[in-house]
Swiss-Prot record:
This is Thiazole synthase. 1-deoxy-D-xylulose 5-phosphate binds at G156, A182, G183, N204, T205. It comes from Shewanella oneidensis (strain ATCC 700550 / JCM 31522 / CIP 106686 / LMG 19005 / NCIMB 14063 / MR-1). Gene3D superfamilies: Aldolase class I. It comes from the Bacteria. Its EC number is 2.8.1.10. Pathway: Cofactor biosynthesis; thiamine diphosphate biosynthesis. Keywords: Cytoplasm, Schiff base, Thiamine biosynthesis, Transferase. Belongs to the ThiG family. It catalyses: [ThiS sulfur-carrier protein]-C-terminal-Gly-aminoethanethioate + 2-iminoacetate + 1-deoxy-D-xylulose 5-phosphate = [ThiS sulfur-carrier protein]-C-terminal Gly-Gly + 2-[(2R,5Z)-2-carboxy-4-methylthiazol-5(2H)-ylidene]ethyl phosphate + 2 H2O + H(+). Its main location: cytoplasm. It is an enzyme of class 2 (transferase). One of its GO terms (cellular component) is 2-iminoacetate synthase complex.
Amino acid sequence: MLTVAGVEFESRLFTGTGKFSSSQLMLEAINASKSQLVTVSMKRIDLKTGADDLLTPLRQAGVRLLPNTSGARNAKEAIFAAELAREMLGTQWIKLEIHPDPKYLMPDAVETLTAAQILCERGFIVMPYVHADPVLCRRLEDVGCAAVMPLASPIGTNQGLVTEPFIKMIIEQARVPVVIDAGIGAPSHAAHAMELGADAVLVNTAIASSASPIEMALCFRDAVNCGRRAFEAGLGRVQTQAVHTSPLTGFLQQ
């Protein structure tokens, strides 16, 4: 069981809501994934007009919403988006995203740390999307973040765990849940992240852009479960020298 800010989750697969061809398909994929925490961009929610209505199907699914500040270019904009989310959705949970560069969508470490400290002081449950920087993740823990979400590779690229060496360091020293976010492009990537000891993964593009999002959601669900079970069972130590599994000469001496 995964616990974030005192809330328990049976599923360690978190999902997003972007890039699906319809709200119905999104809902079916989320249901198939068994995800219990779903991110939603504040840019897409319009409670007045109901345009691109995400809230109704998500509430029908019974999932916990994790509004994000995607589109924010600095701490001030991110804090505004978080306050708006709290007012509109009635939740303290926020995925903090600040990426001023529209080409690569790299998170701004300085602005993220600044915003995280202020939001934590205001009572938010902050889950920041950041570079796989062990020092930064420790600082974010220190200011009160409920979890850290280091990127595996750039958003939407499906490159997998490019930052693996640094993710290992973050997992090793973390005192809060580590959720691998961005760049997870295949179920095998998700399984590997879980084998490393990550507490959860967040997947959006790989599911939503699949030719069969529902089937892909099922694949990710199973991959995350298997990866976690493998981690808990204990993986064998990686070595450079061959180690025989049976006596090499014993039967020749009989």
